Amino acid sequence: MPTINQLVRQGRKKLTEKSASPALKGNPFKRGVCTVVKTTTPKKPNSALRKIARVRLSNNIEVTAYIPGIGHNLQEHSVVLVRGGRVKDLPGVRYHIVRGALDAAGVANRMQGRSKYGAKRPKAGKK
C-alpha cells in the first residue's frame, strides 16, 4: 500500500492492454507471402489435420496463420491477406488468412456463411 506522499510523487500506473495480434501493428489486415504451407494436429481432446501457413508479412514479421474452409490453393510464395483471430485448439496460431483475397481462392460450393469464405453467390437455378 503506497503512502499519500508516494502517490503524489508518482501516481498510479495505467495498465496497458496487450494486443491479441501484435504483428499487425494496429492494422485490420496485412499482406504477406507464404513461406511454408503444412498441416498440424490440434491439442487434446480434438483430432484433425488443420491447414496452416507460415507467412512473412509486409513488415517483415513472420507469423503462423490458419487457412479456413474446406480445401485451398495456397503454396509457397502465394501472396495472402492476413487478419487477426486465434485458433483455440492450435497453440501459437493467432492469425487467419482471408479467403477470396489476393492469391487465396474462395471456398468452392459454399452456400452458407459465404462472405467469411470468399464464395460468390450461386446462380439462381443451381441448388
UniProtKB/Swiss-Prot annotation:
CDD domains with a match to the protein in the record: Ribosomal_S12 (cd03368)
Start and end residues of each stretch annotated as Disordered: 1-25
GO molecular function, one term: tRNA binding
Known partners and oligomeric status: Part of the 30S ribosomal subunit. Contacts proteins S8 and S17. May interact with IF1 in the 30S initiation complex.
NCBIfam families: rpsL_bact
Family: Belongs to the universal ribosomal protein uS12 family.
Name assigned to this protein: Small ribosomal subunit protein uS12
Gene name for this UniProt entry: rpsL
